[in-house]
């Protein structure tokens, strides 16, 4: 079976960019084994042939209606897949999904029926928000940095003063 990426250089480039990011996360120790998720909106690279592809999975419920995602397509990291493997073989460790017309469900259309991670509804909600606001951003990513996880298991790092310093260093505040 040929890959959906064949003869689609722009789509292949975007999926390979996500794979490259997965590689960086793995190499830098910023992703704990299979922890984390990458979801990429690829709708602008979808052609009529892709739109006509049949589902290769059952219909899956998102759990919420996301109206801005109608007829959108996403590349998603698969559940229990490692970032290092996604970096080498993105279509064996992820899949392409189509959001259905009800805006509350999706199907996998390529290349293999690799189920997205459990964080997919959260990522899709982020994409829905980005589209609603007219944002040019097309990727949603989260991960579990190994060292940060290790720190949360150390009593010293759970003490009030150290935790306060850690929170103060976050730019998001």
Where are each of the predicted segments found?
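Glycine-rich flexible loops
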Residues: 1-173
